[in-house]
Amino acid sequence: LAQIEQLADDSGGAFDPTLGKVIRLWDIDGEDPHVPEQSELEALLKDVGYQNVTLDGNKVTLAEDTTLDLGATGKGIGCDVISEFLKDQKEVEGMILNLGGSSVMAYGQKPDDSPWKVAVTDPRDTESDYLGAITIKGGEFLSTSGDYEKYFMEDGKRYHHILDPKTGYPVWNGLDSVTIVCDNGLLADGLSTACFVLGMDDAMELLEKYDADAMFVDEDKNIYLTDGMKERFELMKNTYTVKAVQ
């Protein structure tokens, strides 16, 4: 929780673990996905804010009507737990773990010492060939957040599950997906969400603070790579253009 609160603060609230009620209102991956009334959103947004969570050692205090939702980092936390468990399993020399398609952990080495490679989904053609591959080392974690994972269409508009904590609406900033590589599963998950909400330009300072590599895919089929990601990424689709982050 301390890591989550710190990330929320460092991202200026772009990542917010108290957004659960608003997420459930949209019901995007449920049986009744719909666009809520503005009045419904406003009623719930007044209780949203990571500042409403107070940590004192192992004691967690929430402001009245504020709820805590760790769903955005759940798979990353799972990767961290498994990584720690594997350290005591001497018979396991190396493995790669994929949780739900969006969170990946590499542990140890492959038998032939070649690098681990993780395929990256094309956010606008999820059923076809992969967009590319990213190399990660043992002890590294990869997470992708995209508007193609959970969404519904209404009046020609895509309503996806990555919500802006300030407005309660899906983030529409020209990005289709963000992929993060770093040395912590929770942070990889949280950073991919935070950077999607912030947008590429505003995410740079946050990425530098956490020493994380990133790939941004936009709606015009441009792929922007941070310096560290340039060495990791291999393009597999010539319908996309690779560019450096300015």
For each predicted feature, which ranges?
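Mature catalytic core of soluble alpha/beta enzymes
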Residues: 1-246
